[in-house]
A protein has these predicted regions:
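Short aromatic-glycine-enriched beta-strand elements
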Residues: 45-47, 126-127
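Intrinsic disorder/low-complexity detector
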Residues: 2-33, 41-43, 68-123, 156
């Protein structure tokens, strides 16, 4: 192998490595979804979700609406990839409607959580959640565990 061929090989390997690193950074960039809770009346959350994939925040009302909108976002981004196909009785057409509130303020009136989703396995989510006001982070193994962590922060 000539010196020129060797240098081209090294250059190609560097390009491949940089591409892999860039994809991993972008992957991590989209894995965090910020959930801003503005109201929590009768244990029904109202607020907004933000993700770097979205141009603006998305409003939600209730736990089901929150989970469906995050799941729709995850499906659109394909990140993290689901390990199983979603099953439904009827397809849902929930649009990711932009929030009407000021998008510069990514804090909830009651609480703000950063959800880092690492996996979507066994028809659930796994990752970690950071409660900004309480300055604590906890791992969760299921959506139920995530919701219980959020509820415990909101009912303290």
């Amino acid at each position: 192998m000539t010196e020129r061929e060797y240098n081209q090989t090294i250059k190609m390997e560097c390009i491949i490595i940089m591409s892999i690193i860039k994809n991993q950074v972008l992957d991590n960039f989209f894995r965090i979804t910020v959930v801003c809770i503005d109201e929590y009346e009768k244990k029904i959350p109202h607020g907004r979700i933000y993700n770097n994939y979205l141009e603006k925040g998305v409003e939600f009302t209730g736990v089901i609406d929150l989970l469906k909108k995050i799941e729709l976002l995850l499906e659109e981004m394909n990140c993290p990839q689901s390990f199983s196909e979603r099953r439904v009785f009827r397809p849902s057409n929930i649009p990711l409607k932009a929030s009407q509130t000021d998008d510069d303020v990514k804090e909830g009136k009651l609480a703000t959580f950063s959800i880092r989703l690492l996996f979507r396995q066994n028809a659930s989510w796994q990752g970690s959640v950071t409660w900004h006001e309480g300055r604590t982070e906890e791992s969760f193994r299921s959506v139920l565990e995530l919701l219980l962590l959020i509820d415990s922060a909101l009912t303290e």
